[in-house]
């Protein structure tokens, strides 16, 4: 855990009750222990007195399980914020868009992030890529994320099959 000496922050993304719902629209889920593992990581982080930032998703769709009026919007019991832990709310699939996160991290001289949460192929993936683009050293902890099967067309395959264009 060499990164502990680098003023890191634990970024807990979208660990909300909606993802416990068996009817959550997203297909079959993997890693049903992700929230428990995130809770254990959070406990250790708190013991060490390190920076903790909770990010939650607030859907703008009033019918979504992640809308602020629904029980699924609440934080999972394993990772409920305590004391002065920062809570940010986002409306898109990146923890950096519309939250002020980059400025907050810079104001605390944080340059290293450990990211855990939901879902691997959406908000985690996007936030990790943006963190890297913004210059943060970023870590993911094995088994600290989960995702759902892709339902319908896998759009990543479209990019692979696009013809290659070469300049002459």
PLM feature spans:
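Single conserved hydrophobic/aromatic residue that forms the stacking wall/gate
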Residues: 158-168
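Active-site acidic carboxylates
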Residues: 1-86, 103
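Short Gly/Thr/Asp-enriched flexible loops that form oxyanion-binding sites at enzyme active sites
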Residues: 124-134
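Short, hinge-like loop/turn segments at secondary-structure boundaries
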Residues: 69-73, 132-133, 155-158
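Glycine-centered short loops/turns at secondary-structure junctions
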Residues: 49-50, 109, 135
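A short glycine-rich beta-strand->turn/loop micro-motif centered on a GG-aromatic cluster
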Residues: 114-117, 137-151
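Internal catalytic-core helix/loop-beta-alpha segment
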Residues: 84-121, 125
